[in-house]
UniProtKB/Swiss-Prot annotation:
Lineage top rank: taxon: Bacteria
Spans through the membrane: none
Gene: cmk
EC number from the UniProt entry: 2.7.4.25
Key words, A-Z: ATP-binding, Cytoplasm, Kinase, Nucleotide-binding, Transferase
Binding site for ATP: G12, P13, S14, G15, A16, G17, K18, G19, T20
Catalytic activity field: CMP + ATP = CDP + ADP; dCMP + ATP = dCDP + ADP
Subcellular location: Cytoplasm
Cysteine disulfide partners in this protein: none
Name of the protein described by the UniProt record: Cytidylate kinase
GO MF, any single term: (d)CMP kinase activity
Length: 225
């Protein structure tokens, strides 16, 4: 990581609002954006496009090393551009998710993608969205944020999103799913979900997105002086 490129990391559990916060911060700061949660799906999609064996580390490592991907904040969405093509919709397909699970299980591929993620830290600055950005990927980042919210609030937000899409979902089932995922993420052996020691912990449970952005920007500006 170049010492001339400021890095802002935003970690936290699923549903805390990391994606929205990172998109807005990248726009306001004029920084590049890294959505680490999508990176394995992007690699899997590149492998599918190029006919690369999803279980061959020898074939996947060079692809991961030179992965041509950009994350662009546009409107209310983050567009994912792979080799010049908008693949945002393709990334959400079940086939892509299944392929991502295969490539994520390969240690050398994970190492190559770690290096590729670190290479995003170039130019005017970077906002990195993930779960271990401040602890593993960018431990020397200038500004680290851990965005949290209660499991109940995260379930409520997700419930509202799904209802707006016309989907019939049960709140209790969503809450249970989020609590189980939290437990897995916080207790896994490799890179457990936790705030970096020098991170600002922001609890968004009772805050609006504007309030979260305002607090985050004040903190970032104090760190990037």
């Amino acid at each position: 990581m170049s010492s001339h490129t400021p890095v802002v990391t935003v970690d936290g559990p699923s549903g805390a609002g990391k994606g929205t916060l990172c998109m807005l911060l990248a726009k306001k700061l004029g920084f590049q954006l890294l959505d680490s949660g999508a990176i394995y799906r992007v690699l899997a999609l590149a492998a599918l496009h190029h006919g690369v064996d999803l279980e061959s580390e020898d074939a996947l490592v060079p692809l991961a090393t030179h992965l041509d991907v950009q994350f662009i904040a546009e409107g209310d969405l983050v567009k994912v551009i792979l080799e010049g093509e908008d693949v945002s919709r393709e990334l959400r397909k079940e086939e892509t998710g299944m392929a991502a699970s295969k490539v994520a299980a390969l240690p050398r591929v994970r190492e190559a993608l770690l290096r590729r993620q670190r290479a995003f830290a170039s130019g005017i600055g970077l906002v990195a969205d993930g779960r271990d950005m401040g602890t593993v990927v960018f431990p020397a980042a200038e500004a680290k944020i851990f965005l949290d919210a209660s499991a109940e609030e995260r379930a409520r937000r997700r419930f509202k999103q799904l209802q707006l899409k016309g989907l019939d979902v049960k709140f209790d089932a969503l809450l249970s799913e989020i609590q189980e995922r939290d437990d897995r993420d916080r207790n896994r052996a490799v890179a457990p979900l936790r705030p970096a020691e020098d991170a600002l912990v922001l609890d968004s449970t009772t805050l609006t997105i504007d309030e979260v952005v305002e607090q985050a920007l004040q903190y970032i500006e104090s760190k990037l002086v």
